[in-house]
Amino acid sequence: MLEFKFDTQLLIDGKNLDEDAINDYFTKNLKGDCLLAVGDEDLIKIHFHTNEPWEVLKYCASLGEIYDIVVENMERQEQGLKG
């Protein structure tokens, strides 16, 4: 069984986005692992494993427009099912 079962990925389109601030927020406030937050001031790609993807979406939506949202259940994938 995975500790964090949802692979959460999305793009944030915003202004003055700060990779370091986003990384700090995730580390301090969201439960999960495998964080990737990369991009520039206008566009950030997020990848994060969590059990609470809605918290990721809520935070990211507060930073700008979110799109290309993918939430996959890795436990189902591990069992050979659609995630």
Predicted feature residues:
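N-terminal loops that bind phosphate or other acidic moieties
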Residues: 1-83
